[in-house]
From Swiss-Prot:
A GO MF label: methylenetetrahydrofolate dehydrogenase (NADP+) activity
Native source species: Cenarchaeum symbiosum (strain A)
Keyword vocabulary terms for this entry: Amino-acid biosynthesis, Histidine biosynthesis, Hydrolase, Methionine biosynthesis, Multifunctional enzyme, NADP, One-carbon metabolism, Oxidoreductase, Purine biosynthesis
BP term (GO), one: methionine biosynthetic process
A Pfam family matched in the record: THF_DHG_CYH
The protein's name: Bifunctional protein FolD
Reactions catalysed according to its record: (6R)-5,10-methylene-5,6,7,8-tetrahydrofolate + NADP(+) = (6R)-5,10-methenyltetrahydrofolate + NADPH; (6R)-5,10-methenyltetrahydrofolate + H2O = (6R)-10-formyltetrahydrofolate + H(+)
Amino acid sequence: MDGKAVAAAVKERVKMAVAELKSGGTDPCLATVLVGDDPASGTYVRNKHAACAEVGITTQDHRLGPSTTEGDLLKLIAELNSDRSVHGILVQMPLPEGIREIKVVSAISPLKDVDGLTPLNAGLLTAGTATLIPCTPLGIMEMLDYYNIELEGKEVVLINRSRLVGIPLHHLFLGRNATVTTCHSRTKDIGSISRRADVIVTAVGNRDKFVLTPDMVKEGAVVIDVAISRSDRGLTGDADYAAVSEKASHITPVPGGVGPMTVAMLLKNTTTAASLVKSLER
């Protein structure tokens, strides 16, 4: 499954949505907030700005020093919430010690929550009525649809229970009438569970503790590998890619699978947020 190709198709649709919004007087704008000087976080933010430029989304780049307090950050978020020219707010994680992530995320306006992580948007997702959905889960669903993977009545196993991936995916798959099982670090004998799955989504990210091997996958299953592990071999996912590819009908590579979809969905969510704000201004 080629995440780059699917992401390119999504970006073309986003370009059209941006052009339509601009023709109606709305210039979609994403504001990013980076606290501290973590090099990896800086790279991620630059990549997001570059992706926005590709599709015509305007950006604001807010950089705060490592001595920034939680109060300073909350004040900036309040300003961005009230700024009518800003449609999406993204606070790059992780945050420095002493700043509570839940406090920061909860401060973002749900209408501008392009990460889909505010308590309100998380609750709407459980009810099946969310408009802004976490980018990685949304990208996974987009990729499955692109490849015409039928989900209704299928058995899905998630090997992750985080609020970024596993929990949102659980609700998204339930909404598509799949039967969903969630595995995690305390699950005993994950292979006995994953072997019955039609779709496996794995996002552990620690090859020393977990590798998805062919004996854990049934013939013809779809394998979505969200994980990224760095080693002297380069970037790898959870799956033993070459071996599992022999059994899977579809599998995502690492890199080049889910990663590009996450960025593409950020762009999509930004245009969705701009449309929401525009509709409320009528």
